[in-house]
Curated annotation (Swiss-Prot):
InterPro entries, alphabetized: YnhF-like
A Gene Ontology BP annotation from the UniProt entry: cellular response to hypoxia
Main location: membrane
Subcellular location, record wording: Cell inner membrane
Protein's membrane topology: Single-pass membrane protein
Induction: Constitutively expressed, repressed on shift from glucose minimal to glycerol minimal medium, induced in low oxygen (at protein level).
GO cellular component: cytochrome complex; membrane; plasma membrane
NCBIfam families: small_mem_YnhF
Residues forming coiled coils: none
Provenance organism: Escherichia coli (strain K12)
Entry keywords, A to Z: Cell inner membrane, Cell membrane, Formylation, Membrane, Stress response, Transmembrane, Transmembrane helix
Residue ranges of the TM segments: 7-27
Record has Nuclease as a keyword: no
Entry protein name: Uncharacterized protein YnhF
Amino acid sequence: MSTDLKFSLVTTIIVLGLIVAVGLTAALH
């Protein structure tokens, strides 16, 4: 696996995690 592919994959996971966290926070409040 190339470094660029691994980096973009990690970035995508982090972004998705942030979106989910913001969505849950908005839903709870």
